[in-house]
Amino acid sequence: MAAPAIYQTDKVLRFEVPGSRRPSTYFFALVLTLGGLGFLFAGLSPFVETNLLPFSDTRGLTRFPQGVTMIFYGALATLFSLYYWLVLALDVGSGYNEFDKQNKKVTLFRRGFPGKNRIIEIVHPLENILGLKVQIKEGLNPRRAYFLKLKGARDLRLSPVGQPQPLAAVEDQVSAIARFLNIGVEGI
């Protein structure tokens, strides 16, 4: 996963946070769509007494239980694929982290699902920042996350959710933020 784009001036530091538009999400959406439609057409073939799949022979399938079961699994996979395509279209989870010395604030912006929380924007004054916290866990389920420590509030996650970023990207971003805000880093 590539490091998010950086926009930096002497007054503003901005990191783009990638959302759901990753190659793995496109892959799963495509596989679920093709597999779900394949199962759906295979399950419907015994009911319409026509082979709806030109690359396969469905004459051996019976209406019950095989046809009904394949229709059920095909419909379920198609619904899941619709969810994936919706998440991709809305780019859920994408946004930016912006540190603004001129307006003396930090802004965390993310896109969500339609409704009350479609746009998530968290703004804190720079004076409330205590430092950065880094959590690095290697092994079978690696975790590489960094948080903004705030006075009187819980830690805010700055790193993207999903696949862990490369260690070099985490170090670059954390050091850029720490240098820009002149704050300390704990956990390294």
UniProtKB/Swiss-Prot annotation:
It is found in: Cell inner membrane. Its main location: membrane. The keyword Repeat does not apply. Seems to be required for the assembly of the photosystem I complex. It holds the Pfam family Ycf4. InterPro entries: PSI_Ycf4_assembly. One of its GO terms (biological process) is photosynthesis. This is Photosystem I assembly protein Ycf4. The gene is ycf4.
